[in-house]
Amino acid sequence: MAKAKFERTKPHVNIGTIGHVDHGKTTTTAAITKVLADAFPDLNEASAFDQIDKAPEEKARGITINISHVEYQTEKRHYAHVDAPGHADYIKNMITGAAQMDGAILVVAATDGPMPQTREHVLLARQVGVPYILVALNKADMVDDDEILELVEMEVRELLAAQEFDEEAPVIPISALKALEGDPKWTQSILDLMAAVDESIPDPVRETDKPFLMPVEDVFTITGRGTVVTGRIERGSVNVNEEVEIVGIKETSTKTTVTGIEMFRKLLDSGQAGDNVGLLVRGIKREDVERGQVVVKPGTTTPHTEFEGQAYILSKDEGGRHTPFFNNYRPQFYFRTTDVTGVVTLPEGTEMVMPGDNTEMSVKLIQPVAMDEGLRFAIREGGRTVGAGKVAKIIK
């Protein structure tokens, strides 16, 4: 087979395996690494099942999650792949965004078909904004009857369509175990799966290509020069002499011009996603800007006070609450750099939320926050994290 050469210019895509416990998510991950390592040895190393299964702990927004990262390449792309072994870890990762996903491989056992967690994962993927799902129909070697495979495929497609994912997404029958054992037929099924991943998961939009946004971390005055706002640029880029808008927390937004950009005490012509910068802003007093606001390309982000969110509430063992909460719960919602108090309304039919639950909620904040759908937040009580969530829908 022709050797693919390593190119830094390859698109980088973050993906993950999702699906019901015991349907073979981790085995599928291991099979992908092995088959690609055999096909493109100078690009890939195989990761054994037990390496992936012993997922190291990570902290994201104050929550501990067990999660494994592996990387591999096809001829077209470089992939970072996350696998969360436990159902709870999976849910926590989806909601906190510890590992972003540009697309997901839904693993469904052909012997079982979609199960309750399959549905829950797909629903959650929709709510946290995973852009694309395709399907690995695993354990296909154990099903002799093609009609059964077709039935399972139909069920999976209905499930995807119900959550507004692509009903025509590739559904690839595989046997991860047989591929790990080196069976040529099933090794090919993994190559087919990765060809489908290459083709169907769209290239992600890079952060630098999005409109400029920088959360304000600090504000100070430089005598003789004016007001400087500092922070890490979250997305996009900004140039000297460009107009920007300062949004959130206050009733009205303020427009101003960036007259200087500084990083590590050096002056720059522009700053881009990932840079920690100080922006010198024209005609703005120190008291006009505060932590928690964002500096943006004018007109690209708006402040809101009411939204629907999907949240995971920490269990007692994770350092969360010891007791449930009810309607009209009033914690702080930590967005980007600041806490804002909000009042929680639970979905109809939900009496209370227990520590360890994941839930939908409507929130009404006491101050406006610059937000887009998909923005993540922590739920805090007096500085202690008790939950994490993501904005699913902006109401007002």
UniProtKB/Swiss-Prot annotation:
Region: G2, residue numbers: 62-66
UniProt-annotated binding residues for Mg(2+): T26
Keywords: Cytoplasm, Elongation factor, GTP-binding, Hydrolase, Magnesium, Metal-binding, Nucleotide-binding, Protein biosynthesis
Region of interest called G4, as start-end residue ranges on this chain: 138-141
Record-listed E.C. numbers: 3.6.5.3
Location (main, coarse): cytoplasm
Catalytic class of the enzyme: hydrolase
GO cellular component: a single term: cytosol
Region annotation G5: where it falls in the sequence: 175-177
Keyword Nucleotide-binding (UniProt): yes
Catalytic activity reported: GTP + H2O = GDP + phosphate + H(+)
Record domain tr-type G: where: 10-205
Protein name, per record: Elongation factor Tu
Native source species: Rhodococcus erythropolis (strain PR4 / NBRC 100887)
Gene: tuf
